[in-house]
C-alpha cells in the first residue's frame, strides 16, 4: 500500500539556519557600528594632560585650604590658652576674696558686698552688679576686677567658639579639595590603563625624554653668542632662591608637597625662597601678590617668579633665555621648559 505522507523538505531547515546566521551577522555588524572606538594614544594623552592640569588647579585650592586650617588652628590654640590663663586668674581672685571673707566672718564683721557676692555661684555675679554698685564697699576694687575678668573670659570663650566653627569648615573644605585632586588623578590613571602596554610604554618614554631634556639644559648656554642679560639674577635673594631650586632639578612632582625631596609648583618656589631666608606665601595665587609685578617677558630676570593661566594656578622661576625652572605636574620632575609652553600672565620680583 502506497504511503500518503508528505515528503520531508530539507530545504526549509537550511533556509532557517541561513536566515538566523544572517540575522546574527547583521546584529553584530550593527553593534560594531554603534560601539565607540577606543581612543588612541594621542587622544588619551590630551585627556590625561587636561586632567593633570585640573588636578593642579585643585591642588592649589587644597594648599590654600590647608594653609587656612593651619592658621585657624594656631588662633584656636592661642585663644584656648588665653581662656585657660584667664580662668586661673579669675579663680585666684575669687580665692583671695574668699580668704578675706572668711577672716571677716570669723571676726564677726562680714562686709555686705562680700556677703552678696559669695551668696551664690560667682558666675551669676554680673546679674547682681547694679546692687553691688550701690554698696560702696571697701572691697569694690577687688569685686570690679573679678567682674572685668569674667567679662573678658566670656568674650574669649565666644571668640574661641567662633574660630572652632571656622576651623571645622576649613577642615571640610580641605577634605573636599583632597577628594577633588585624587578624583582627577584616578580618572587620568584609568585612561592610561585603557591603553595597550605598548602605547603606555610609548607615553612613558615621551615623558622620560622630556624630563631628561629639561634636567640637562642650561638656559645660560642654550643661546649661542652673547649671553642673555636676563640670566643675571634679579637680586641676591632671588639668586639664592634660584640656586636652591636648581639643586632640586630631577626631584618628582607630588601634589601638596613642599620638599625637600618632592614638590608641587608653589611648594617648589616657596621652599626655594625659604632656603634664602625669605618667607613667601604657600599658594601660587598668594605668591602672585608677594612682590613687584612684571608684565613684559623682556623685563624678566633670573629668579623672578613667573605665573601662568588666568587663575594663576601655576608658578615657577624665570631661568633666562626664554626658559623657566619649575615643578610641572604629576609624572614630571623639576626641570627647565620653554616659557611659551603655557599661557604666561606676568612675573613677580621678590
Walk through the language-model features, giving the residues of each.
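Short N-terminal segments immediately surrounding and downstream of signal-peptide cleavage
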Residues: 38-52
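Short hydrophobic/aromatic segments of transmembrane alpha-helices and their interfaces
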Residues: 16-18, 106-109, 136, 157, ...
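Amphipathic alpha-helical segments with strong coiled-coil propensity
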Residues: 49-56, 63-70, 74-171
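Secretory-pathway/luminal and periplasmic proteins that interact with or process carbohydrate-rich
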Residues: 104, 190, 279-281
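Hydrophobic packing segments in regular secondary structure
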Residues: 1-42, 166-247
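Extracytoplasmic/secreted proteins, especially bacterial periplasmic and envelope-associated proteins
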Residues: 50, 57, 78, 92, ...
Amino acid at each position: 500500500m502506497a504511503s500518503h505522507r508528505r515528503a520531508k523538505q530539507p530545504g526549509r531547515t537550511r533556509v532557517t539556519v541561513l536566515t538566523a546566521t544572517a540575522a546574527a551577522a547583521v546584529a553584530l555588524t550593527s553593534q560594531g557600528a554603534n560601539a565607540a572606538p577606543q581612543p588612541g594614544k594621542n587622544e588619551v594623552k590630551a585627556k590625561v594632560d587636561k586632567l593633570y592640569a585640573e588636578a593642579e588647579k585643585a591642588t592649589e585650592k587644597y594648599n590654600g585650604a590647608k594653609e587656612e586650617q593651619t592658621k585657624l588652628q594656631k588662633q584656636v590654640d592661642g585663644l584656648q590658652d588665653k581662656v585657660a590663663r584667664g580662668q586661673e586668674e579669675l579663680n585666684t581672685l575669687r580665692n583671695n576674696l574668699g580668704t578675706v571673707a572668711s577672716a571677716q566672718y570669723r571676726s564677726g564683721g562680714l562686709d555686705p558686698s562680700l556677703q552678696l557676692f559669695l551668696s551664690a555661684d560667682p558666675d551669676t555675679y554680673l546679674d547682681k552688679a547694679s546692687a553691688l554698685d550701690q554698696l560702696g564697699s571697701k572691697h569694690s576694687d577687688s569685686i570690679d576686677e573679678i567682674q572685668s575678668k569674667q567679662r573678658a573670659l566670656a568674650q574669649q570663650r565666644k571668640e574661641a567658639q567662633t574660630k572652632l566653627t571656622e576651623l571645622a569648615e576649613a577642615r571640610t573644605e580641605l577634605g573636599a579639595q583632597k577628594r577633588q585632586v585624587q578624583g582627577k588623578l584616578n580618572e587620568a590613571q584609568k585612561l592610561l590603563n585603557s591603553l595597550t602596554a605598548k602605547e603606555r610604554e610609548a607615553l612613558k618614554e615621551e615623558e622620560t625624554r622630556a624630563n631628561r631634556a629639561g634636567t640637562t639644559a642650561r638656559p645660560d648656554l642654550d643661546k649661542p653668542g652673547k649671553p642673555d642679560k636676563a640670566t643675571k639674577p634679579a637680586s641676591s635673594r632671588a639668586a639664592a632662591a634660584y640656586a636652591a631650586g636648581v639643586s632640586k632639578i630631577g626631584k618628582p612632582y607630588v601634589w601638596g608637597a613642599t620638599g625637600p625631596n618632592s614638590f608641587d609648583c608653589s611648594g617648589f618656589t616657596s621652599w626655594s625662597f625659604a632656603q634664602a631666608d625669605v618667607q613667601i606665601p604657600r599658594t601660587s595665587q598668594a605668591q602672585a601678590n608677594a612682590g613687584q609685578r612684571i608684565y613684559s617677558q623682556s623685563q624678566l630676570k633670573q629668579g623672578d617668579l613667573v605665573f601662568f593661566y588666568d587663575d594663576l594656578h601655576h608658578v615657577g622661576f624665570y631661568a633666562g633665555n626664554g626658559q623657566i625652572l619649575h615643578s610641572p605636574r604629576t609624572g614630571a620632575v623639576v626641570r627647565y621648559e620653554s616659557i611659551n609652553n603655557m599661557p604666561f600672565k606676568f612675573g613677580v620680583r621678590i
